[in-house]
Structure formats: C-alpha cells, structure tokens
Amino acid sequence: MDYRVLLYYKYTTIDDPELFATEHLAFCKDLELKGRILVSTEGINGTVSGTVEATDKYMEALKNDARFQGITFKVDEAEGHAFKKMHVRPRQEIVALDLEDDVNPRELTGNYLSPKEFREALLSDDTVVIDARNDYEYDLGHFRGAVRPDITRFRDLPDWIKENKEQFMDKKIVTYCTGGIRCEKFSGYLLKEGFEDVSQLEGGIATYGKDPETKGEFWDGKMYVFDERISVEVNHVDKTVVGKEWFDGTPCERYINCSNPECNKQILVSEENEARYLGACSHECAKHENNRYVKKHNISDEEKAKRLENFKELVK
C-alpha cells in the first residue's frame, strides 16, 4: 500500500502552542498530510495520513526535535488518506479530563505493561481491567472481561470512578485505551484518588494488536478509530464480532452517525436497516426536516412517509 496512518502522542513542554500549531500546520501541508493534531503546553496528540515518503519525513522531523525525544509512532498501512483535511489546533489539554487539579503524566502515571504482561493481567483473577474509552468504542470492540464505564466522553470518567470507587478500591487496576494517551492521564488520576496498584497497557490497543507474540489475543470485535476507516482489526488469533445492530440486535460492526444533524449519535447499523430507517436512530430523528440521508438520496416526501411507517414494526 502507498499510504500510511500514523497515531502518536508525546507529553512534553511546548512553550507557545499557538505559534507551534501555525508552523506545524504549514509543515504538514507541505508534506500533503491530512489529519488532526492537538497541541498544548503539555504536549502533542495526533493522527495523520499520507504517502509512505511523506510520513517517513514527518516521523524523522519529530524524532529529531528535542521536545519529542522518544516519541513512538503506531503505523498502519492504508490504501489512501484517512482524513479529508489537515488541522493542527491549540488546546488547553491534549486529552481532556477537565480536572480542577490536573494530572501531569510526566510526574504521576501508572506502571507500564508490555503486551505480554497485559495479556497475563487479563487472565489474572485478582485484577480488574477498566476500558478508558467511550461507551461506543467499547461496544464495537474490547478486551474480554473488561469493565465498560458508562460514559460518552473521556472527561466524564472521573465522575464514573467516584460513583463506582468502592467496587475497585482494593483491587489491582489495569487500564487501556486506543494508543495509550488517555491511560497515561487516567492512571495518574487513579493514583491521585488513592488507588494503590495501577497499571496501563503501554502503547494501547494499537500496539497490542501488532505484537508478534500476543497477536491481539483476547480482544473481541474491532477497534474504533477516529478517522474515515472507523474501525480496524486487532485480534489475529480468534476473531469475534461483539457489536450489535441498533435495530435488530444481530452481529454488526458498521458504524454510522444518525442522519439528524442535531443528534449525530453513533449507531451500529446494517446497510439494509440504514435505508429502511432513513439512516436515523429513532422515528423522531428520521422525520427531522434536515435528515441528511433523505437529502443525500433525494428521497421524496411520499417515500419518506412510507419508510417512517417502518418504525411502527419495531418491538417496543
């Protein structure tokens, strides 16, 4: 394949994020990269796509920058760009927990586990494995037996922990996320909250799936990614599907956004049911005047009314 997708982050000091963002955007555009990069005084968090030559130049440039010494890139081969545009944006945090007293992973974070060590932890009876991602990411794929926090945003995780603290306080905690950046901060937060034995999967699911020894074993489903691919394979030992179709509950790994632009909820839907229910998550959203599916497919008012009737057949 002629293209690659890079996933990376580095907690480091960037003195002037706004200036860095402006200059870095120009650099990325010169390389004809596309993607999303967040920068703040605490570091950089990015995912970009580009040709093999362009991504080689990009990785070399960051590795030669003293601020990013030791940066690790997770690399996926791709058939083309995984993004439509290139954005580099300054932010308060490169991953938002929105804590009053923020956690600095360079000073406080959980123990790092290699893929092999993490696999052993998955099999341990005295260890609780907590998924540090959002609920819709978990629903598409997760490690076998992992706890699913009921959250739609990373910043909601601290409140969820406070509500469920008593269940886990005396346990060994192991956490994981897509590439490792959320766990760096989340595991530090757990230590700050009084949890004593906290570890994290170094390099995240992306690293675990490429490890030649673990081969993604004990991962069920697919890994959600924040680009146009939507999902990627992880388990190369015994693949299973855990995602359930929004309307009929059958196995499904196809995510779409609800066609109501004011909702935009992510749902797992088959192509057949996307058409049947006008790309929406509910009758209310399907009948919305700005339904994107209706506009995209030039569906007449008569046909729209006909398909809206399909919602009556759903089990209440």
From Swiss-Prot:
Task: Enumerate the InterPro entries for this protein.
Answer: Rhodanese-like_dom, Rhodanese-like_dom_sf, Rhodanese_C, TrhO, TRHO_N
Task: Report the catalytic activity.
Answer: uridine(34) in tRNA + AH2 + O2 = 5-hydroxyuridine(34) in tRNA + A + H2O
Name all Rhodanese domain ranges.
Answer: 123-217
State the UniProt keywords alphabetically: Oxidoreductase, tRNA processing
* Top-level taxon in the UniProt lineage: Bacteria
- Its EC top class is oxidoreductase
Report the record's disulfide bonds: none
What does this gene product do? Catalyzes oxygen-dependent 5-hydroxyuridine (ho5U) modification at position 34 in tRNAs.
UniProt name for this protein? tRNA uridine(34) hydroxylase
